Amino acid sequence: MSNKLFENGRFFLGCNWWASHAGTNMWQEWDEAVVEDDFRRLADAKITVVRVFPLWSDFQPLRMHFGGGQTPREIRLGENPLPETEAGRAGIDEIMVERFSTLCDIAERYGIRLIVGLITGWMSGRMHTPEAFLGKDLLRDPLVVSWQVRFVKYMVRHFKDRVAIAAWDLGNECNCMSSGLSRSECYVWASQITNAIKAEDASRPVISGMHGTLPSDASVWNSRDLGEILDVLCTHPYPLFTPHCNTDPINGMKSALHATAESVMYASTAGKPCFIEEAGTLGPIVSSEKIAGDYVRASAFSAWAHGLYGFVWWCANEQSALTHTPYDWESIERELGFFRIDGSKKPVLESMSELASFIEGLDFDALPERITDAVCILTHGQDVWANAYGSFILAKQAGLDVTFA
């Protein structure tokens, strides 16, 4: 199984995944049989890439122990001193490492390639922070960042020889883990984590894992900066959360082109490959299952036709039966899966399987380079996304293809 996810030019279709029985609690409530069944069903449906998340608070369960006057005294693994082992020095729970290794074994058996979101401290509207770091700035505090670097270096060093792993991801939307950062502080954090990954494994691409970055001076998480640091950029183009997008029916032209337009803007302005790492309708509050299937058919096909690398759905499984946070906080997190609670397929998965079969049937791996008719120059002091998106849509209506600078 090749792990060259962004080099052979073949478009991939994938999903973000939490185990169907437990969601974000899967590492604590580990069930190998469920994980195996999840991956078997995904492989049967022609899903070839899965983004997975070693939850930060489970894998690095550090706790600060305090002395008199609430003086910080010692970081431990729960109540136990840090062992004098490689894992102990990184603050890693070795039981979780064994479970992640089993996950890699299962992925290899089913020919599924993994994107690993390393610093997953934010997920679906809830923070998952090691107790030792509660109340600290998770992207600026030197104590926190030093332990993040140890965590990343250990995980990458330990798993870099696993065939199933195709790419490393900084983590899930790490720009949601702090606020008030300067552009320079964002640059420094992203560089530190990327350099920690590459110090252990220079053979695999590193992906941003971010959402809502822009190539504008006003964006502190700046996609041009991330293009300097990282190998691959990504978009998380949910219409509900993206300015100027939640205006039309989800199966209309404007919505269908949103993910492509945003990804083309990132790739062309940053000079790095881009793919759609999280796509979704956010469930029945936005559209019916049938209309969601129509949306995916148009959006994923558009991404392929424009030379993007892949389309990854959020997410594999419905989570409407789960009662822990964030699922009992957020109605939009509960009914997003390919599979219903009873295991039956939704139209979204049928649409993606159909596109996978279509691409498999072609006698070439990659489309020729996209021909563009014009360049839209995004200048300083403007709403770059409004202008890029509007220009992209208007150009399509006029029969033109544009890129951005």
Residue ranges and their predicted role:
Residues 20-27, 243-244, 383-385:
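Short, solvent-exposed loop/turn elements at domain surfaces
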Residues 28, 65-71, 179-184, 217-218, ...:
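Short, flexible/disordered intra-domain loops and linkers
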Residues 97-99, 255-259, 290-298:
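Charged helix-capping and loop-helix junction motifs
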Residues 183-188, 192-195, 199-285, 318, ...:
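Glycoside hydrolase catalytic-domain groove-lining segments
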Residues 2-230:
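Active-site mouth of glycoside hydrolases
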Residues 1-18, 266-293:
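Mobile, glycine- and charge-enriched loop segments
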Residues 269-270, 280-285, 290-405:
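Carbohydrate-binding surfaces of carbohydrate-active enzymes
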Residues 49, 113, 166, 205, ...:
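Beta-sheet entry/capping signal
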